[in-house]
Amino acid sequence: MTIERTFSIVKPDAVKRNLIGAIYRRIEKTGMQVVAAKMLSLTKEQAQGFYAEHEGKEFFDALVEYMTSGPVMVQVLEGESVITRYRELMGKTNPDEAACGSLRSDYAISMRYNSVHGSDSPESAAREIAYFFVEDEICPRPAE
């Protein structure tokens, strides 16, 4: 059993609609654990840095504007195959294509306002976690 970590964001549209608890319940119901979390209002510079890989793409400015439009919840999730499992729980980026019962199918407003983010690889997870958390802010929880 390989325990891994992934990074997750509850985006401004979901925070504004008071969906944090509902999203956390769904995460925990699947056996994944929240091992670090904080609410932030991203600055333009933080959002640009986090999404630097998309700089120059036509949607970049709108993405930065959206991610700075209100508070977000950033969290580290831990569990077996958590990167793959959380991406399955999120569903496809476009909520119209997301599997029924996924977070995006249930909560996203549109492709732009798609409620959640999750790392797509172990490398991305490590980079994204380190962008917002230092190691001693992460509190592993014993398995039941």
From Swiss-Prot:
Transmembrane segments: none annotated. Keywords: ATP-binding, Cytoplasm, Kinase, Magnesium, Metal-binding, Nucleotide metabolism, Nucleotide-binding, Phosphoprotein, Transferase. Its cofactor is Mg(2+). GO terms for molecular function: ATP binding; metal ion binding; nucleoside diphosphate kinase activity. ATP binds at K11, F59, R87, T93, R104, N114. One of its GO terms (biological process) is CTP biosynthetic process. It catalyses: a 2'-deoxyribonucleoside 5'-diphosphate + ATP = a 2'-deoxyribonucleoside 5'-triphosphate + ADP; a ribonucleoside 5'-diphosphate + ATP = a ribonucleoside 5'-triphosphate + ADP. CDD domains: NDPk_I (cd04413). The active site is at H117. Its EC number is 2.7.4.6. Gene3D superfamilies: Nucleoside diphosphate kinase-like domain. Homotetramer. Major role in the synthesis of nucleoside triphosphates other than ATP. The ATP gamma phosphate is transferred to the NDP beta phosphate via a ping-pong mechanism, using a phosphorylated active-site intermediate. Belongs to the NDK family. This is Nucleoside diphosphate kinase. It comes from Aliivibrio salmonicida (strain LFI1238) (Vibrio salmonicida (strain LFI1238)). The lineage of its organism: Bacteria, Pseudomonadati, Pseudomonadota, Gammaproteobacteria, Vibrionales. The gene is ndk.
